[in-house]
């Protein structure tokens, strides 16, 4: 049997998606205020350092003349309970007079957690675990970092139906179409917005000679960090990534490779 606030949590999750790439390193969060079975205010975390979803939702309610004390707050992630770039969301929720809060997922960040207990101590009825898997997927990258201190990794792979990326002789051509390539550049731009990186191995670096940048019709807000790994240290002018330096670049190689004159030349160029 579904929870009575499940549909509202799904709407909050859709709102959270709007901040997926811009909220980093914070998690993406969405919130709605519900009164008499109707969503009357909405909010999401738009960018790091700006108001969190709960506060944005309360601002929307104020702009619409909605009394939040007569509403239920539905939010995808437990309201934060600490002073960071912004004040604790729990304070805003309590000050607004909200008496019922429905949460999708508890916050895995020990610095921000404790919101549920804080609200309960203030007399707020709190429910958690509504659409938990959906809300967990929303913040998969944040969860991995908080629990393992590892980066969230996405694999981009293009191959033929028989699992090939080139012929036996090494000859290759575009496998993906124009639409897919455009989507890849959109993904690169979003990864850059989130402060992420693109990583390639030595074969891709030396064979494809990639720039590892996002190239779209509109200006790209922030290019992703370019990272490559190879036991072969290239001459700085032999590859576009090091010759043109279109973005911040990191090159990993062996200890012996790092001691070569070519490696010294790369360092001189800021790699």
What are these regions (language model features)?
Residues 25-28, 152-153:
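Short, small/polar residue-rich loop motifs at catalytic or cofactor-binding pockets
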Residues 33-134, 225, 245, 250-257:
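Zn2+-dependent cytidine deaminase-like catalytic core
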Residues 24-26, 66-70, 221:
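Short helix-terminating capping/connector loops at secondary-structure junctions
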Residues 29-37, 157-158:
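Short beta-strand scaffold segments in enzyme catalytic cores
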Residues 4-24, 142-145:
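Short, basic/aromatic recognition patches
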Residues 144, 154-271:
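Active-site ligand-binding patch in enzyme domains
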Residues 139-152:
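Flexible, polar/acidic helix-loop-strand segments at domain edges
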